[in-house]
Amino acid sequence: MENQQQDIIKNQVTKRRKISMEENSSIAKTTIKLKNTIVDEPLSKYKSKILPLEKELFENLNLEWGVDIISEDIPLIDINNNEYYCHLIRTANPDPDKDNFLFIHGFITSGLHFFALIPYLIKRYNIFIPDTIGMGFSCRPQVKFSSPKQTEDFLISIYHIIIENIFFKNLYNIKKEYYLCGHSLGGFIASRYMLKYPKGIKKVLLLSPAGITNHKIPGTNIGSNMNCCFYCLYIIALTCLWPCKIRAQDLYICCCFHNCIKESYGFYDFNLDEEEIKKNKDGSKFIVDEEKFKEILSNLAILSLEYPGDLNDCIYYLFTLPPSSTFLPIEGSLMYLNTIDIVFVYGKNDFMDKFGAYRLNQYDPNKYKIYTTKFGGHSFAYESPKELYPIFEEFF
């Protein structure tokens, strides 16, 4: 199947294509007016539970809270004086001599998605992992999405404020350059952000990014990249979830699904039984207490679901069907407008579409690198984290 895809791509990449009007319009500079938006205050009953759990989680990763790693809520104000706060996991004492890495998480998750990379990366970089506004444990503004462009502009403008505060307002006395990484929906956001605000970005790492491929190009078949099971789920999502704009939070508060989601959500399927993943380079255990660690992750995931007013419905306005097809594909913009090197990584059993990444690699193999892990699926960053270490060593 991989060879078949590459043959199709080689035939297609020789044909020059114009960037669609949709892609051009998505890059145009715009502003978001949300003066009527009601932004909630930090909810103390959630915050009082979240911080102790995060502290315990990272201590279970052999990281000292307040010395190696810390989390905080940073205040943000947009151009219309709307106030937000962003929950940020970061290096506790940023080193001005180290390089910086900023991570953007994906759909129905938080910055904790990258937990398995933190013990390795924190020794080499200042790391900053914000929860996207409206997700994780950041504030939940009541934004009413209406179109792909408006949704994208909101997310990009918010991240512009976050990144300006971290790197360009001397908040932490660090370098103004940084590496940018995005996973899934976060990969879509990172790509769009890079095209609009390239200042300071050294390289970009896209982990199974959504929204890259332009499915209007002949021969790009979404279903051909999925096994039968995922293709069936794909059709179910198309016919049921998408028209109704159902969120995980909606399912969670529904009596019919409450117990099911509560029992399963947050139990990440990382390979704790594999020694190369369980152990750090110095031989110490990667996770001190595995069962306790799973319990903490589950409790944090449940708190995120119980935290009212999430904005995860943004995907219904950005994508025509998860996780591949988007109203505003990025492939053409990256091919003709991008000046920054990008590394794409996909899991061995990843359901995410790779056509666009392969076409970009064929177009310019020096600027666009692509790798597939030997283990893991869409969430290989915690299923098989050490496979990413050589990529960090080589490119970052």
What are these regions (language model features)?
Residues 1-101, 122-125, 142-157:
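Alpha/beta-hydrolase fold catalytic core
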Residues 352-353, 376-385:
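Catalytic histidine-centered segment of alpha/beta-hydrolase-like enzymes
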Residues 148-152, 159-160, 197-363:
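Flexible "cap/lid" subdomain of the alpha/beta-hydrolase fold that forms the substrate-access gate
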Residues 362-378:
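Catalytic histidine neighborhood in serine/cysteine hydrolases
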Residues 102, 128-130, 207, 345, ...:
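The conserved SAM/SAH-binding core of class I Rossmann-like methyltransferase domains
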Residues 100, 126, 177-179, 202-203, ...:
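Structural signature of beta-strand start/N-cap positions in the alpha/beta core
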